Amino acid sequence: MNAISLAVDQFVAVLTIHNPPANALSSRILEELSSCLDQCETDAGVRSIIIHGEGRFFSAGADIKEFTSLKGNEDSSLLAERGQQLMERIESFPKPIIAAIHGAALGGGLELAMACHIRIAAEDAKLGLPELNLGIIPGFAGTQRLPRYVGTAKALELIGSGEPISGKEALDLGLVSIGAKDEAEVIEKAKALAAKFAEKSPQTLASLLELLYSNKVYSYEGSLKLEAKRFGEAFESEDAKEGIQAFLEKRKPQFKGE
């Protein structure tokens, strides 16, 4: 049985982690997640993605038992680099990815969620990076992404103390963008938002994601030039013609990604 299942309905893909009891992010999980992303990226029938954990947790972190098999600095650094590459791929993915968080998103689980474009969390979920409690540090880019969402001082407090925060606190801090009362509502809200994304032109969604994260590689001026270029490309697309025509005809547009 695969550790990650992939189901697609109405242009929305749901990736579900099946690794009880805590949905730990083992090497196998990371490999299967990468494989699922390969499928989603090339499938025109997928326009938005939800990542969710089966059972009690989104993901309670890395596979600690697997750590005992690492042999020295080289093995551990390689594990971190592989994890970082996957998280970067998720953040750079051309289709929006939503993390649907319930139970706990700790350690590598939170690093996975932070790499997603949007985080929706149950108010009683626990989110944190407790690696320092084990005498190690976050290795899947947690030290880089958390400060972007909550600021450097708050990131130091959260990582340095090793204490988790609730989904409600994470929403107040801006780490989570949408709150929910429980797991059922998390999934409901995630599917509703993913469906809205799926109604849009795939090309414009890809351009939007590229532009929102362009400051990682471009200056402000460079990002503006890229925006102007992508605007011109979008304006000439068949989807733009359809969108404008649908507006004039007072109907819902049917975008085809052309």
Swiss-Prot record:
Q: Which Gene3D superfamilies match?
A: 2-enoyl-CoA Hydratase, Chain A, domain 1
Report the pathway entry. Lipid metabolism; fatty acid beta-oxidation
Pfam families reported for this sequence:
ECH_1
- Say if the entry is tagged with keyword Lipid metabolism: yes
Q: Which GO terms describe its molecular function?
A: enoyl-CoA hydratase activity
> Record's superkingdom?
Bacteria
Top enzyme class of this protein?
A: lyase
Q: Which UniProt keywords apply?
A: Fatty acid metabolism, Lipid degradation, Lipid metabolism, Lyase
Provide the function of this protein.
Involved in the degradation of long-chain fatty acids.
* Family stated for the protein in its record: Belongs to the enoyl-CoA hydratase/isomerase family.
Descriptive protein name = Probable enoyl-CoA hydratase
- Can you name the source organism? Bacillus subtilis (strain 168)
The gene it comes from is fadB
